[in-house]
Amino acid sequence: MTANKRKKFNGEGEKLSHQVSKSMRKYFEQLDGESPNDVYNMVLKEVESSLLEIVMQQCDDNQTRASEMLGINRGTLRTKLKAYKLL
């Protein structure tokens, strides 16, 4: 798949960014007036761990293929997998 043809949509044709926006709105609604802390890091950890888990499944746990798919160094991938206890 070329860079021009890469999809930024979920399986239903909706942009991933739209899904994130909906999830974040719901998160803030559920706070019921409480002040959130460290939202940026929370979102990154939630998204990154899910992304790594799904990509590893798609690559049959082949770290080389997964790192290529993600566009990161294999050593970086291993470090992240260990940090999220996915290895």
Positions of predicted regions on the chain:
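Bacterial C-terminal helix-turn-helix
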Residues: 2-18, 22-87
